[in-house]
Amino acid sequence: MIVCSNMVSSFFYFSPSKKLVLVLMEKEQTVAPGAGLIYGLNDRPPVKETIFAALQHLLAIFVAIITPPLIIAGALKLDLETTGFLVSMALFASGISTFIQCRRVGPVGCGLLCIQGTSFSFIGPIISAGLTGGLSTIFGACIVASSVEMLISRVLKYTRRIITPLVSGIVVTLIGMSLIKVGISACGGGAVAQANGTFGAIQHVGLAALVLVLIIIFNRSSNRYLRMSSIVIGLVIGYITAWALGMVDFSAVQSYGGFNIPIPFRYGISFDISSIIGLALVYLITAIEAYGDITANSLISGEPVEGETFVKRASGGILADGFNSMLAGFFNSFPNSIFAQNNGMIQLTGVASRYVGYFIAGFLIILGLFPAVGLVFSLMPEPVLGGATLLMFGTVAAAGIRIIASQQIDRKATLVMALSFSFGLSVELVPDILCQLPDTLRNIFSSGITTGGLTAILANLLIRIKE
């Protein structure tokens, strides 16, 4: 039986990394099926209650959705208009994905109150793809590689023998470790500060530290709503402080009005094999994560977690996870995944009705259609975002360690971890080790996530030790 981690009391509750923890965790506190529900899966709450529940879910996911495009745009040094559009499309695509997941269109979707949003797990490989060939290469790789997750949904029981909790934990840890350098770079002021010589200035580092400390303070509050909103509060106060220091200029927002038109392939599409392979590995992991998230959601919603109904629900949810990521690529956005923090929100509100998901989807789509929304967040100074993401990325790595720790660490597991972390971190710390390889191989293995993840899969399959 899958269990619901008690990490809700820590940073993992709100951050997107929380979804990484519900994969196949063992030895955590269990949750009684459907305990404390006011409205079940197919109930229709009154409109006012539905809207209120939807807004609470929206609060828990909004920052998580807009942060990946902001980080990717910053790393690729994209202009303000492009960054704003990517943020808007992330909201729009998340709305479409959430509707499909909740509604279940044919075999696609789980039919639960399951919220999807832009995934943190893909940031590293996406940045690598963007540096290789720009946005067209990113979206091409996202679309093609998503077929891996859709295929896994059809052969799920076999895949779980390859992507074990140990392998998942290693990959999740590497994802967090590889992203920490992105977060600390933002704390110093990002690419703009590096270009103008102000990187590491006291105002940048101090602003990032302020946001970080505020998040910690509010996260430790005994008030559950303050705890859930800790990242939002930290970012808002940091943003206001940056404005007071003259670090924000809102004049650009005034020149953008009207609506965003979600034009497919606005930035073109191209294909790079190394980028596709790098993203495909992450899709393998997110498929297994989606299985855990759907199981936990079913349990909390009082639905079966075994039998034919559950198998169809899990397969449909994973299929939707891949399909929605492909759809996001069509609409100039990045891969989506299920947000497990919303499972905690179901417990808090007692509302498991999937009809709430329709309202959440509608809110996200509407927000994505207004350019000013994306632009306001695009103007957020990098140190403000860096203070929050540094903590988020650290929790991703910590979540991976917890997944590993839930398993028996025998001689084989020790060897698998040693090889995976050694190879994965080596190419991150000393990228020149690959300088003599052909371009295609160098691009594939330059990502620590890809190198370490493939090493973990192969080592776990091939190493045999008699205890």
Task: Report each predicted region and the residues it spans.
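Hydrophobic alpha-helical transmembrane segments of multi-pass small-molecule transporters/permeases
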Residues: 50, 54-58, 142, 166, ...
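Intrinsically disordered, low-complexity non-transmembrane regions of multi-pass membrane transporters
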Residues: 14, 19-53, 252-263, 299-316, ...
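Membrane-embedded alpha-helical modules
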Residues: 129-252, 359-467
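Short, non-helical or kinked segments that cap or interrupt transmembrane helices
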Residues: 85, 107-120, 161-170, 227-232, ...
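N-terminal signal-anchor module of multipass membrane proteins
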Residues: 26-113, 121-129
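Membrane-embedded helical hairpins/re-entrant loop segments and their flanking transmembrane helices
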Residues: 47, 73-92, 96-109, 281-354
